């Protein structure tokens, strides 16, 4: 009986070691350029670029299958950052994919909401809370302002409310110039 247990323990250890070695040996690395591009994109998952989310768009840019100017939520600033990262000239935002809008969040008029759950199904970031035939509400901190919840609503109880520019949402609008650290040598 103990022999069978020791055989099973030995097999488990051997298989574990083989699996561990295989995981290290055959590890698939993601595209590091796509990772950097994805970090620049606004993560609204809105699909305005023609891709189902920011990650697929980043991968398409990295492969050269998409242009850098297809993201309206990222605006001109996003295009400039992508151009700088990729070492290409910035392009004007492609208006075929939409125009930049002020940052906003969805708001559900809970008196009008019929609880159909269509908005919940449409939200790519799960920023809508509610149940069938119950009123729904937006989790404002999670909402990216993608507007994907507007179209499926049969009673038009969802509206977009611009985010006020207060301290947590304020952003420096002027270009930031990187300063050299004291003592850093300059190249000639």
Swiss-Prot record:
Q: Name one GO biological process term.
A: electron transport chain
Q: What is its main location?
A: membrane
Pfam families reported for this sequence: Fer4_21, FeS
Query: Its Enzyme Commission number?
Result: 7.-.-.-
- Entry note: cofactor: Binds 3 [4Fe-4S] clusters.
Q: Which residues form the signal peptide?
A: none
What's the superkingdom here? Answer: Bacteria
**What is any one of the record's Gene Ontology cellular component terms?**
plasma membrane
User: Required co-factor?
Assistant: [4Fe-4S] cluster
Summarize subunit and interaction data from the UniProt record for this chain. The complex is composed of six subunits: RnfA, RnfB, RnfC, RnfD, RnfE and RnfG.
Q: Which family does it belong to?
A: Belongs to the 4Fe4S bacterial-type ferredoxin family. RnfB subfamily.
This protein is called Ion-translocating oxidoreductase complex subunit B
The taxonomic lineage of its organism, from the top, reads: Bacteria, Pseudomonadati, Pseudomonadota, Betaproteobacteria, Nitrosomonadales
């Amino acid at each position: 009986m103990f022999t069978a247990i020791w055989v099973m323990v030995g097999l488990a250890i051997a298989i574990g070691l083989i699996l561990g070695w295989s995981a290290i040996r055959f590890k698939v690395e993601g595209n590091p350029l796509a990772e950097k591009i994805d970090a620049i994109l606004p993560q609204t998952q809105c699909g305005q670029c023609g891709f189902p989310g920011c990650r697929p768009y980043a991968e398409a840019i990295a492969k050269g299958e998409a242009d850098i100017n297809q993201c309206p939520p990222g605006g001109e600033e996003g295009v400039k950052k992508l151009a700088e990262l990729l070492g290409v000239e910035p392009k004007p935002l492609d208006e075929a994919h939409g125009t930049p809008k002020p940052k906003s969040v969805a708001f559900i008029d809970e008196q009008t909401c019929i609880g159909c759950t269509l908005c919940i199904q449409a939200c790519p970031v799960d920023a809508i809370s509610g149940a069938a035939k119950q009123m729904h509400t937006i989790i404002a901190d999670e909402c990216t302002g993608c507007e994907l919840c507007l179209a499926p609503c049969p009673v038009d109880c969802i509206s977009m409310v611009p985010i006020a520019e207060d301290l947590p949402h304020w952003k420096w609008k002027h270009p930031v110039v990187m300063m050299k650290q004291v003592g850093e040598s300059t190249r000639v």
